[in-house]
Regions:
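Glycine/threonine-rich beta-strand-loop-alpha-helix active-site module
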Residues: 86-146
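ATP/NTP phosphate-donor binding region
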Residues: 1-104
Length: 146
């Protein structure tokens, strides 16, 4: 996907609002689970990261943690038993964990993605998402419905 062309399409929007996004890359393809480390490396994602998932996303991305370690990533892992609704307490906890790393990899969608996205933005850490399900339009946003 040509993100620069997409960005240019929104430069002179008739609604009068400025539309922009800070998205370096988007990879959508069957088999990307086996390429996560390769994709992150190709985009100079930091090697010292916090990987955040819930138990369901962690289960369906079996082997991702080991793949990252094998590729030389230093990975701190946070797996939630269940997260139905994101809240600021979780954001603040993740912000403390992000102080020890250089980037955050959110595995999944929904509330896990919300707290990762917002805490990464607030701590000025690089952020990547490995989406496991279709979701809303919040992937490129720096805010979250918390």
């Amino acid at each position: 996907m040509d993100l620069e062309a997409l960005r240019k399409e929104f430069e002179d929007c008739e609604c009068g609002h400025k539309h922009d996004f800070d998205l370096e890359a988007l990879e959508v393809a069957h088999g990307n689970l086996d390429r996560v480390a390769e994709i992150l490396s190709a985009h100079n994602f930091p090697k010292k990261i916090l990987m955040v998932a819930d138990v369901n996303s962690f289960r369906v991305t079996k082997g991702l943690y080991e793949q990252l370690l094998s590729a030389g990533y230093i990975v701190e892992l946070r797996v939630y038993d269940s997260m139905k609704v994101a809240d600021m307490r979780e954001v603040e906890e993740l912000e403390r964990e992000l102080e020890r790393v250089d980037g955050c990899l959110s595995v999944g969608t929904g509330s896990v993605n919300d707290i990762c996205r917002l805490s990464s933005f607030r701590k000025d850490k690089q952020f990547a998402i490995f989406a496991t399900a279709p979701s809303m339009d919040g992937f490129a946003s720096d805010s979250a419905p918390i």
